[in-house]
């Protein structure tokens, strides 16, 4: 569903919000600090000179390392928090090999009690107060970013830390896109923003500047859709702040790739796999549709991904035995569909097998790989309340909530559905935005939203090629101006080249 900040229904939703709450082991690449000093006359002198020089080099690196604060953009779900803890240990282990001065390594989901910590900007004032006097850089990374500490220090050492720097691997739009509100429509390539998977850095002077601005001009209550783009826009300040400076050493190549030799950072996971994929019979798929789309959208589902699903039902406002569809007794609405979604949740809990641990709700114009979803779900515990998909936010600068955007698919563990329906949180109207109401409900229940960048609310061409290049995507959304069957078989169909360990395959994807 499209999002237009400022629409009356969003204001109504925010105004009504208070009513509802009544109701792999890591692979650490070896490194060495090697110095070949001048003046070594023979091999007997060399070890002594090396030891002295190396000691001084390590001491300098140790001091510089202490001036970097590492922020892992982690999540509280057990699968993600463990991966973040593993990365933290890896960073500290590398640092320990260089001397006694260890850097600060923080997990973002542990840093702040409020919902919006993952959006970064609300934390800038805390960063400034705590680290503004004794640090030089804040370095952000994802849980699957792999860091070569010595190379990172060498890379950051090229930049004057007393100036304002915004560093990262540059992404850009090749055409204006809805997820960026069609910004820079005349020349979308002119504006760049960081690929979080490669890591990105802010110098402390820039952090202090942002903190000062946020103190005088608090963040507006608005939507968070694509955080990396929105952070870059905020820093740029319509030309008053710095652009992103591209850093070639910030990479998203696989750690074992020949391309990674020059990299300070690499990326380790294109599609997680934690044991055997979940069984087809363990995933129940619910497709939301209506009579007017039975003739054009449902045939696309049947030509593409329906065959991957063992358990699938189509929910409509009209019972059509040729599909077949199930009439839930909920009239169709032009937008929102909250009533229909809650009816689906009730049906899953009361009419499906109690042994089916996972529910997926998709739109009739969602393109999804159930094959890849089953692999992904192998990493999540169905005995935990899991609500998984592409995460958006509403009003997070002022105490709002996160939600899973519906077009890319919403994944629920059975226990999450049980906890939701046991609460009193329900739709305030039948046409309320279902994904936002669900986000608000789960927030009130203390059940975190779990984000996966492999789900997509929009079409492939709405995302930078560089961003998609290190993904094996699970879903896309919308049939607008595309051949959806072609998109499915290009981007989502099970591919014989997909390796068993989830590494990136050599796809032959034409521009769509």
Please state what every model-predicted region is:
Residues 2-512:
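Secretory-pathway lumenal glyco-enzymes, predominantly type II signal-anchor Golgi glycosyltransferases
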